[in-house]
Amino acid sequence: MTAWTMGARGLDKRGSFFKLIDTIASEIGELKQEMVRTDVNLENGLEPAETHSMVRHKDGGYSEEEDVKTCARDSGYDSLSNRLSILDRLLHTHPIWLQLSLSEEEAAEVLQAQPPGIFLVHKSTKMQKKVLSLRLPCEFGAPLKEFAIKESTYTFSLEGSGISFADLFRLIAFYCISRDVLPFTLKLPYAISTAKSEAQLEELAQMGLNFWSSPADSKPPNLPPPHRPLSSDGVCPASLRQLCLINGVHSIKTRTPSELECSQTNGALCFINPLFLKVHSQDLSGGLKRPSTRTPNANGTERTRSPPPRPPPPAINSLHTSPRLARTETQTSMPETVNHNKHGNVALPGTKPTPIPPPRLKKQASFLEAEGGAKTLSGGRPGAGPELELGTAGSPGGAPPEAAPGDCTRAPPPSSESRPPCHGGRQRLSDMSISTSSSDSLEFDRSMPLFGYEADTNSSLEDYEGESDQETMAPPIKSKKKRSSSFVLPKLVKSQLQKVSGVFSSFMTPEKRMVRRIAELSRDKCTYFGCLVQDYVSFLQENKECHVSSTDMLQTIRQFMTQVKNYLSQSSELDPPIESLIPEDQIDVVLEKAMHKCILKPLKGHVEAMLKDFHMADGSWKQLKENLQLVRQRNPQELGVFAPTPDFVDVEKIKVKFMTMQKMYSPEKKVMLLLRVCKLIYTVMENNSGRMYGADDFLPVLTYVIAQCDMLELDTEIEYMMELLDPSLLHGEGGYYLTSAYGALSLIKNFQEEQAARLLSSETRDTLRQWHKRRTTNRTIPSVDDFQNYLRVAFQEVNSGCTGKTLLVRPYITTEDVCQICAEKFKVGDPEEYSLFLFVDETWQQLAEDTYPQKIKAELHSRPQPHIFHFVYKRIKNDPYGIIFQNGEEDLTTS
């Protein structure tokens, strides 16, 4: 019995899950085939005088009716006829419409000369956030209107909208086909919407801001402006509703995408299943096809039609669902479109060549070469079932993939003449992953050119599990050996595994995708960033004598990480810019994690060896080893311990955590494990005594535990964290317990028999002060990273006195939002009578609604002379001075 037969029988017995995947994949593939049939006149560039639609009767038949509605065509419909999706056009031309450095006046000057519906995304200096500037028709009065873009944790949305998206591109693409809170849908510039290939889009993108004043920004002679919906409830006029009623029964009617702006809450939504992101091509060798039925035409002839699309399967919930979006939502599949010839008969779509897949990375090419023997499984079996047909859906025509480019060879984009015919017109709006569900808003296409790579099918499960801390990154120029195996998985099994791994990949957050993208960029020596990182890593590994001490080496690495992070935040090598994918208050966090993976991961082994050599050379480890043995022989009371200590089992648990810490390269993750150890020690102390303990009691217990673990490597681990941890994390619990661990080790190093290990020596205290000053005073400019996300606010009432609460306040939350939080926390009945005040230097200053309390707090902390200040929530009429603080950059001491 062959291996393939055994695998197939195994799937029959245990593969009900795979069978379900096959069924859903087949239905979605057929759905997409039906959805992408465009009008012949549209493909020829002609504007139809009237629109035909297929109306389903209650007896199951279809008839053709004229649609008298004339709505303005949205950008999505134009993109279908031009073989490129809206998302593709937005991604390739973002240097044109994404102008974050543009001021309000410059944006208004650009849009004044544009037709209604054209837009720009820039950053407003007044609102301190990104805005969508939209050109309005004359009947609206004002020529422009700005819509603020709200940035939450890794999502983007318009102010007032309940729909969130993973990045700006999907947000703009959605509003090109649905208006939601906008007065009408967005429109792409004429040159962008009519471009036929990616090469043309890239040529336009090279103009950047000059595109708006160039001849390329040409408009058609009679471009109709976008219209508002004719009714507020989002339903088309009564004449159109009558077409949907046959014998008093509602019928299912297919609609063109241009009608989507007339159907808001009751209209068709775009559906995407993250399991399947590619349109399944038809089997040219006579595979299974959906049975077609014949319906009598109006003139008595029969015409072939496909059955109506089946309802889509339920959407997969995201792992990180926004609370306001975690509600039940109904998703309707996009209606199918049918081609008509001039005689009114339905024209069957012609078979078009299947597109050749783009060049893949080397590791993918080797993986696909190994599949060569299994590619002809379905081709050699005329009666192959649907499973085998799905197995070859991803490999069009059995054509081999193109050769992968070299390390520094960039394949030029194919021209429109040499590009093979693709299914650009067949790419439905659902391919943009647009939906009102949070799972779709957080989902990225794996084949999307956003990050310039395709996910490796061999390591999809590893990508889902996140970053691997227990291995060091391989050198960037290391050939991957092909694994030889006596058993080759059949194409069927590989296809199923790829689909399942695609689900795991779709669950990755934008943060992890960006970190992985930056890590790939750091290994690309064709980029300046890649050369910078690789040259520095090679220099450190080859020149071990360039540092005089362990502290000097770690400080140099930290300084390089900070400089590279600053370069990357301003560089154009991240295309598209990181601001369009990650909210501003999370950019530094994402870049810091990327630096850990790009720099610290390949240097982990080298840094560990160098730290060990330094401490062995200066004799500190020898002294530490002797003192550890001496401390272990003492009773806890002799060490100044008067609280319960962990038993042998708890000490072993702590030792396992310390050993796990050694395998990690990220200082942030090391600190998280250290916090778990400290929490475990505190739990043992409190549970065994029934009372709370402070820091004076905790330090001797921590010293005792470290001595019992007997690990010399803890010395280098703590030094590693203290020098490489991001300074913004030194102000919280991580920095506090990190200094506690350093103090415990200092007590062991300086342990004397006649002295209890309870108090730190003056030398250790001075060392900690110098370390804290060195790590924190270099950040002179106040930043959103210099403070915690908490704000202490006092509530003052005439009768009840003053009380206070600690509120969770993000850096970009305004005073108006803080007042709303205070009104809820303090249970104020008339919040309009209250406001937030700043009390500093014996003066009261009422904060304006558009100021940022956390930025004010950071600026006060960064001053050379410390100021005592308080945020007070109190009645406005009790303000004796009536001083309004308008700007966070003004002098806080002037009244």
Swiss-Prot record:
GO terms for molecular function: GTPase activator activity; GTPase regulator activity; guanyl-nucleotide exchange factor activity; small GTPase binding. One of its GO terms (cellular component) is endocytic vesicle. Residues 97-190 form the SH2 domain. Residues 284-361, 373-442, 460-481 are annotated as: Disordered. GO terms for biological process: endocytosis; positive regulation of endothelial cell migration; positive regulation of endothelial cell-matrix adhesion via fibronectin; positive regulation of vasculogenesis; small GTPase-mediated signal transduction. It is found in: Cytoplasm. The keyword Phosphoprotein applies. The modification Phosphoserine is found at S366, S501. The keyword Phosphoprotein applies. Keywords: Cytoplasm, Endocytosis, GTPase activation, Phosphoprotein, SH2 domain. It is linked to MACS syndrome: A complex disorder of elastic tissue characterized by sagging skin and occasionally by life-threatening visceral complications. This is Ras and Rab interactor 2. It comes from Homo sapiens (Human). The gene is RIN2.
